[in-house]
């Protein structure tokens, strides 16, 4: 998946509210409700320490403050440490953090210091977006198209298979597609023989990966991928329910998974 930019995180609260409205239309629950029902957990005054990390490409502008806004949106008490890196971790623990959130170029993690549970953003994001898609109340079948089968897409596709969906998978990386077909038993999707789906799960860092030939009227596209998998024109033409938000849904999944 692509690294986020400060522009992706602008107006994060507005993006969360819009995503919440769409998730509620699609599933009957808001994001918190889906996470609570899926993980069987509820926040209870956990204090979250957000630690900026300077390694690799450095700190993404707005990232830590966006995490603070997201955690508070979902009912957690949170703070951003003054210091980054190891000093920030020490500061977070000394100031009573029960959960640590921190990220470098490769890993975004949540660690519950009380119970020892730890979560990685990539599988948590794939799984929760797949879970939301699986709950689409207007789905006309158990067939799902999964586009992108990497570190986010594979866990999502596996989750859908485990829930009993018939998953048709596509990835531009043929070796990755073949491995997923072998590991999960999904059906490889052939673009030259298109069919339409009411549920589409997309997890790539590329734009316009969902062609018109696979879109059905009022389908749901659940995608953590940035940029957007579908054009605005196609979204409006087919009345697509688009679930797409840069950071909050995946973060909520991480937090609920470690409570």
Swiss-Prot record:
Pathway: Amino-acid biosynthesis; L-pyrrolysine biosynthesis. InterPro entries: PylD_N (IPR048757), Pyrrolys_PylD (IPR023914). Keywords: Amino-acid biosynthesis, NAD, Oxidoreductase. It catalyses: (3R)-3-methyl-D-ornithyl-N(6)-L-lysine + NAD(+) = L-pyrrolysine + NH4(+) + NADH + 2 H(+). This is Pyrrolysine synthase. NCBIfam families: pyrrolys_PylD. L-pyrrolysine binds at residues 4, 53, 60, 103. Pfam families: PylD_N.
């Amino acid at each position: 998946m692509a690294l986020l930019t400060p522009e992706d995180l602008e107006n994060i609260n507005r993006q969360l509210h819009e995503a919440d409205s769409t998730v509620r239309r699609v599933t009957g629950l808001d994001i918190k409700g889906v996470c609570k029902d899926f993980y069987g957990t509820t926040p209870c005054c956990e204090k979250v320490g957000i630690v900026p990390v300077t390694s690799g490409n450095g700190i993404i502008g707005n990232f830590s403050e966006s995490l603070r806004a997201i955690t508070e949106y979902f009912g957690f008490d949170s703070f951003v440490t003054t210091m980054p890196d190891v000093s920030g971790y020490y500061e977070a623990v000394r100031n009573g953090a029960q959960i640590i959130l921190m990220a470098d170029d490769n890993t975004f993690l949540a660690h519950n210091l009380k119970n020892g549970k730890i979560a990685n953003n990539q599988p948590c994001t794939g799984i929760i977006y797949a879970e939301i898609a699986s709950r689409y109340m207007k789905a006309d079948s158990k067939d799902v198209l999964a586009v992108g089968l990497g570190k986010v897409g594979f866990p999502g596709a596996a989750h859908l298979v485990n829930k009993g969906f018939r998953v048709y998978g596509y990835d531009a990386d043929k070796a990755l597609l073949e491995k997923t077909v072998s590991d999960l038993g999904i059906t490889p999707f052939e673009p030259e023989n298109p069919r339409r789906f009411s549920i589409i799960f997309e997890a790539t860092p590329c734009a316009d990966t969902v062609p018109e030939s696979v879109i059905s009227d009022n389908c749901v596209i659940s995608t953590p991928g940035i940029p957007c998998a579908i054009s605005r024109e196609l979204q409006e033409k087919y009345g697509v329910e688009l679930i797409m938000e840069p950071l909050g849904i995946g973060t909520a999944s991480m937090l609920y998974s470690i409570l």
